[in-house]
C-alpha cells in the first residue's frame, strides 16, 4: 500500500516490526519536481515504543491484516481499559499506552468500538466517529453580551475540555467528534 494511502490507525510492517500509525504530516514540495513526503508518528504493536519515519508518497508499505471485533467499554482496571466483545463475551484488555489520547472519549457504556487484534492479542482500539459525553463544568451563558457566537470551554465527564456554544449548560449531554475533538451538537 502506498504511503499516501495510509490513514491514522493503520497497522504496517516496518524495520522488522509492527507499528500503528498515530499521526500523519504531509509536506508539500518546494519548487518544481519535488516529491510530496509523509511523516508518520508510529507506535510499536504491541509495546508502544514511538518511532517517527518519513516516506515518499509512492513508497510502498506492507499493511498488516487485523481482525476487528466490535466491543463495548466494560470497566477500567487500574490504568488498563477492559472491553467486552458483544458477540462472544470475550474480554479484551488494552493498556493506557495502546489507548493513547482516545482515553478522553471513553466513558461508561460506550459501545460501537472496534478492538483490533493481531494473533488473537488486542493491540489497538478504533472509536466510533462521535461519542456522547456529559458536560460537568462550563461557565454560564452571558445574556445580551454580544450578537456574535462565542464558544466557551466545557469540561466533560472524562476530564477532557472542548469548546462549545454559549447555550450549552452544565449537566447536558453532547456529541464529540473523536477524530477532531470538536463539539458535534446536543445528544438526543
Swiss-Prot record:
GO terms for cellular component: cytoplasm. SMART domains: EFP, Elong-fact-P_C. Pfam families: EFP, EFP_N, Elong-fact-P_C. GO terms for biological process: peptide biosynthetic process. Gene3D superfamilies: 2.30.30.30, Nucleic acid-binding proteins (2.40.50.140). GO terms for molecular function: translation elongation factor activity. Coiled coil: none annotated. Signal peptide: none annotated. Belongs to the elongation factor P family. This is Elongation factor P-like protein.
